[in-house]
């Protein structure tokens, strides 16, 4: 998403890693599954699923029927921002994982570290 372009860092080459703040991008409507501890977001057969596990503190899992052509996801230590189909479908949620062990099951994707947002006071 254009709001994170300036924050993009180096590529993450492994499908298993422990970054807290990172970016995921995939084109061509392919299926994917991303796990952060016991939180999971996945897409298969035109269904986007969000499974919170214990990271959601009792919140219900979510399912959306949507045909995803492209997706960008921003993860930080306790939130996810998902932009599908050039932003025509969006999803934001909080989650509270007990660790940041990430596992990606997907093909033809890009994962990148994200830099920190600096908030400065203007004089």
Regions from the PLM with identified roles:
Residues 1-123:
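Beta-rich accessory regions
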């Amino acid at each position: 998403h254009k709001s994170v372009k300036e924050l993009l860092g180096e590529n993450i080459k492994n499908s298993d890693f422990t970054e807290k703040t990172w970016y995921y991008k995939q084109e061509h409507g392919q299926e994917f599954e991303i796990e952060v501890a016991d939180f999971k977001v996945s897409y298969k057969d035109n269904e986007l699923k969000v499974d919170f596990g214990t990271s959601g503190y009792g919140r219900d899992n979510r399912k959306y029927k949507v045909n995803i052509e492209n997706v960008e996801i921003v993860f930080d230590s306790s939130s996810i921002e998902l932009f599908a189909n050039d932003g025509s479908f969006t999803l934001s949620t909080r989650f509270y994982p007990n660790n940041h062990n990430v596992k990606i099951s997907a093909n033809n994707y890009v994962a990148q570290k994200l830099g920190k947002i600096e908030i400065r006071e203007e004089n």
